[in-house]
Structures are given as C-alpha cells and as structure tokens.
C-alpha cells in the first residue's frame, strides 16, 4: 500500500540533541510511522543564539490498507504535542 509523507520543522534549544528528538518522534509516531529522516539543521541569529531548527521527513504506511490524510495528520499532532511538552519546541 502507498506511503504518505509529512515534513516537520522544529525550533528547539541548541543543547537538545537531534537524536533525542528523533527518539520522541519514533515513540509517539504510532504504528503507521515507518521512517524518520533528519534532512536539515539550520542555525541563524534570527532564531536566537541558543536555538536551532531541525527538519524531519516522516513516512507513514499501513501494510493492510491505504492511509487517509487524517490518520497521518493525527500521528504528527501527537508527535508535536509530546515534543512541545518534553522540549518546549516551536513548530515552524
């Protein structure tokens, strides 16, 4: 069955490793999350000296059926909620 992708960009404190963010994404992504790829790390003084932006590509897929957009969107919502709670991220 076809996969669907979502990209998320997160503004986060420089002290938080990208690996820790990815661990949360994997733990909160649900059964349909099949891959996570960090594709950009951006630092700029406009973000603040203690901030960076991390961009991830998330792939969702079911082995039993085609996912609808709402299912993938709900997974992303759960991920963002947990990242905000745990790391005080801001979605970009």
Regions picked out by a protein language model, each given a short descriptive name:
Residues 1-92:
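A carboxyl-terminal module marker
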């Amino acid at each position: 069955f076809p996969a669907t992708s979502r990209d998320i960009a997160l503004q986060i404190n420089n002290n938080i490793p990208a690996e820790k963010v990815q661990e949360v994404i994997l733990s909160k992504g649900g059964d349909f999350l099949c891959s996570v790829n960090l594709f950009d790390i951006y630092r700029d003084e406009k973000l603040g000296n203690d901030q960076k932006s991390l961009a991830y590509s998330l792939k969702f897929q079911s082995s039993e059926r085609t996912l609808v957009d709402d299912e993938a969107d709900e997974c992303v919502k759960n991920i963002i909620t947990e990242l905000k709670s745990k790391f005080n991220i801001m979605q970009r």
